[in-house]
């Protein structure tokens, strides 16, 4: 048995007997299901919408090479830079090289599962670069020294009392803050982090082949701030995130929001199409997109496993 698998089994046996942990998880799942049951009413025929999305993803994955090359062509025409990474180390080296070129000492980050996949944060920390998670749930996990618990709700297993104690212990926040007060307290800390950051790093919800752009959907606005204040924006994504057209977002964004959080649409939906142009007054001076393989082409070659690349990371399962 692999050492990591052995450790997982040992820790999971302990966790399943933790009744308080189970209570918090069951509560979170119940709230998610209630939100989904309300939110799905935005679709007149949800099952047909899901089938249509699956068909689009099937066609895209079947012609993945074509759409990725189209994205690269369009994105570079807009002044963006595309980096292909076969494995995590190549992606990490690319990020580090950019940081060195920009003499970066601080990085702000929005939620990204692919950066968890390549273990970006500890890598940058080992090279003397300060990395701050700006999604509230991710920030809580970072302060706790823990990985995200769930791809949509990273700290769903923590109670408000636990978070209040954590903020008091780690950030010297007043004891016993309510959730709204904790949010305001975090905002005050992170605002200065955005201003001071040299580089902003985001994940990607969808790559748009026809216009050569990156689509990011969020509820807190932190991804926009990560890309607005720093002079350099790095977006890191798996190669399977591609969609043929910007028009597909009319289907995929509501599907993602409904299944992820029960919303009709998330609060902030942004399309990034490259670095700031000469006549534009905001945005990064440089934008990079790192396209990560890390075994995805092996999955693509496996007919039985290929369907897993249709996943849009809504977290509903």
Predicted regions and their residues:
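The feature marks the mature, well-folded catalytic cores of soluble enzymes
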Residues: 1-306
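Cysteine-centered iron-sulfur cluster-binding motifs in ferredoxin-type domains/subunits
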Residues: 305-317
């Amino acid at each position: 048995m692999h050492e990591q698998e052995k450790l997982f089994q040992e820790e999971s046996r302990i966790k399943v007997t933790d009744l308080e942990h189970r209570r918090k998880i069951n509560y979170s799942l119940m709230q998610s299901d209630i939100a989904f049951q309300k939110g799905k009413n935005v679709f007149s025929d949800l099952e047909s919408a899901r089938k249509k999305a699956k068909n689009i993803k099937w066609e895209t994955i079947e012609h993945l090479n074509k759409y990725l090359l189209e994205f690269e062509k369009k994105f570079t025409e807009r002044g963006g830079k595309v980096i292909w990474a076969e494995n995590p180390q190549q992606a990490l080296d690319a990020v580090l090289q950019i940081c060195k070129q920009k003499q970066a000492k601080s990085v702000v980050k929005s939620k990204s599962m692919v950066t968890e996949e390549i273990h970006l944060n500890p890598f940058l920390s080992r090279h003397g670069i300060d990395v701050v998670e700006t999604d509230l749930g991710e920030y809580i996990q970072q302060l706790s020294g823990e990985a995200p618990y769930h791809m949509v709700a990273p700290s769903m297993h923590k109670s408000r009392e636990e978070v209040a104690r954590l903020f008091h212990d780690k950030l010297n926040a007043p004891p016993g803050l309510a959730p709204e007060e904790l949010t305001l307290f975090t905002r005050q800390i992170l605002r200065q982090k955005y201003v001071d950051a040299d580089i902003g790093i985001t994940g990607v919800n969808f790559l748009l082949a026809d216009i050569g752009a990156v689509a990011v959907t969020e509820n807190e606005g932190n991804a926009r701030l990560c890309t607005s204040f720093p002079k350099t924006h790095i977006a890191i994504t798996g190669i399977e995130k591609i969609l043929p057209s910007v028009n597909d977002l009319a289907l995929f964004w509501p599907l993602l929001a409904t299944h992820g959080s029960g919303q009709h649409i998330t609060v902030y939906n942004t399309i990034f199409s490259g670095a700031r142009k000469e006549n534009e007054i905001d945005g990064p001076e440089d934008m990079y997109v790192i396209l990560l393989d890390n075994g995805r082409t092996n999955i693509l070659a496996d007919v039985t496993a290929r369907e897993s690349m249709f996943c849009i990371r809504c977290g509903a399962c």
